[in-house]
Every structure is written in structure tokens, then in C-alpha cells.
Amino acid sequence: MNSLSIFFIVVATAAVCLLFIQGYSIYENYGNIKEFNATHAAFEYSKSIGGTPALDRRVQDVNDTISDVKQKWRCVVYPGNGFVSASIFGFQAEVGPNNTRSIRKFNTMQQCIDFTFSDVINIDIYNPCVAPNINNAECQFLKSVL
């Protein structure tokens, strides 16, 4: 064996040892890793400290360009009437006669998700927290879910 062969054997042995050490480290800390992931799962697609948005680019949705958590659209349980889509901007709205707006309600969570995150741009928004109805029940509910 020449010196070059010995050098490559030493490098390969060191690399294999490092892989075993990393594997053992993951094995020993697996419970802590799962706990960390569960704790920070809510921040998976939020803006990172470095300023680069961490986005799920596989599916385009309305929350992809938003980094403020309160501005992100979400489906929440509406008291007694199914589900609604809400954000700091208000609720997804249904436009009735005379251009009156009311909260769009869904029977199931899946219907709410399908409507909120569909490819169609939903621009009808009803915000119950604008004057003069700042203290109504709908505004209080919106503030409570944000």
C-alpha cells in the first residue's frame, strides 16, 4: 500500500465515523427534536429572521405573500353557524341586494378551505370593525380569533 491509499482509507474511515456520530446524536435527541418541531410548526411558513420568506411554493394561495400572522386568511368556527374565513382585513363576504355585505358562512371546514384558498381571487370582504359598528358582536368575534 502506498501513502495515497492510506490517506483515502483514513478519510473514508473518518467520514463513516462522523456519519455514525450524527446518527447516534439524532437517535439520542429524537424526543427533543419532535418536541421542537411540534412547538415551532406554526411558524413553518412565516417570515424568517433573515428576511427571506419561507414559502411553500408547491401550491399558490392567498397567504403566500403575507408575512404578518394577523393578515393571513384562516378558517375558524363561527359560533353556532359553521365556519367563516377571517383575517385582520375582515371576513370573506357575500354581497346581497343593494350592495349589502354579510359574512360568508360555510357548512364544513373543507368548504371554507376550498373557497378561501382557491385559484379564484375573492375580493369581497366585510369588516365589521369599521365605524360606526365598532363594538358589535361580529367585530368582537373577529378580534377574538386574531
UniProtKB/Swiss-Prot annotation:
One of its GO terms (biological process) is membrane fusion involved in viral entry into host cell. It is found in: Virion membrane. It is a single-pass type III membrane protein. The chain crosses the membrane at residues 1-21. Its main location: virion. Keywords: Disulfide bond, Fusion of virus membrane with host membrane, Late protein, Membrane, Phosphoprotein, Signal-anchor, Transmembrane, Transmembrane helix, Viral envelope protein, Viral penetration into host cytoplasm, Virion, Virus entry into host cell. Residues 22-146 are virion surface. Contains two intramolecular disulfide bonds. They are created by the viral disulfide bond formation pathway, a poxvirus-specific pathway that operates on the cytoplasmic side of the MV membranes. GO terms for cellular component: membrane; viral envelope; virion membrane. The keyword Phosphoprotein applies. InterPro entries: Poxvirus_A28. Envelope protein required for virus entry into host cell and for cell-cell fusion (syncytium formation). Belongs to the orthopoxvirus OPG155 protein family. Part of a stable entry-fusion complex (EFC) which is at least composed of proteins OPG143, OPG147, OPG155, OPG086, OPG094, OPG107, OPG104, and OPG099. Formation of the viral membrane is necessary for the assembly of the complex. Interacts directly with protein OPG107. This is Envelope protein OPG155. It comes from Cowpox virus (strain GRI-90 / Grishak).
